[in-house]
């Protein structure tokens, strides 16, 4: 469990390592969520029972898309003062967190989800025909679902969940609360991703998958 949690933090779930984040699950605990999970050896971590920031999860995808190079998510490119002079931005430095070959091979391992996997129907309905990596996700009771997708140009994640005081199962087509849920990550979450990304997918250059590294195959 420890290695898995540490890898999640390295790839982008950085808030898990912040002191006090375990208080969401134990109000009197000042540990980081990462230490809380590791100390109790909670193997269910890999199934996703803990809250996750969608920006950080998208940053995990961006790390893999960048050949294992983690950079802090930042929407600001440059800042200028009133005189037109550029103002220095103090940002955390980028970091090579896993070998490039490992990141590239994992991106290829995730490349079939939208071809023959659970994300394929949504990709086809949007007319998506570009190489990409993706993963659908659904909670056991269908109370939430999500889709993570990325190319060498973009990375994005979206969730659908019931944020009402009394959450229930969710059903698809149309999306709604229901008694016996059937919402999956490959339905509305994936459809939303492809609807948003298809028009802009090639705006910043050619979309391609990196080669796999034989050391990790």
Residue ranges and their predicted role:
Residues 8-39, 159, 164-172:
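Active-site-adjacent bridging/hinge elements
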């Amino acid at each position: 469990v420890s290695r898995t949690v540490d890898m999640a933090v390295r790839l982008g779930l950085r808030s898990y390592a912040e002191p006090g984040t375990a208080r969401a699950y134990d109000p009197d605990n000042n540990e980081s969520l990462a230490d809380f999970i590791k100390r109790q050896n909670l193997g269910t971590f890999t199934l996703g029972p803990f809250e996750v920031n969608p920006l950080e999860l998208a940053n995990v995808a961006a790390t893999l898309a960048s050949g294992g190079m983690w950079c802090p998510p930042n929407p600001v490119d440059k800042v200028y003062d009133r005189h037109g002079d550029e103002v220095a931005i103090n940002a955390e430095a980028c970091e090579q967190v896993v070998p490039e070959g490992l990141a590239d091979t994992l991106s290829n391992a995730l490349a079939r989800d939208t071809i023959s996997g659970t994300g394929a129907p949504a990709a086809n309905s949007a007319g998506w025909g570009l190489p990409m990596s993706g993963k659908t996700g659904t909670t056991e009771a269908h109370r939430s679902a999500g889709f993570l997708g990325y190319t060498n140009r973009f990375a994005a994640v979206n969730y659908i969940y019931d944020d009402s005081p009394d959450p229930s199962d969710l059903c698809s087509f149309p999306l709604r609360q229901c008694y016996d849920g059937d919402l999956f990550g490959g339905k509305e979450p994936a459809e939303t991703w492809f609807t948003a990304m298809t028009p802009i997918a090639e705006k910043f250059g050619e979309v391609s998958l990196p080669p796999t590294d034989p050391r990790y195959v």
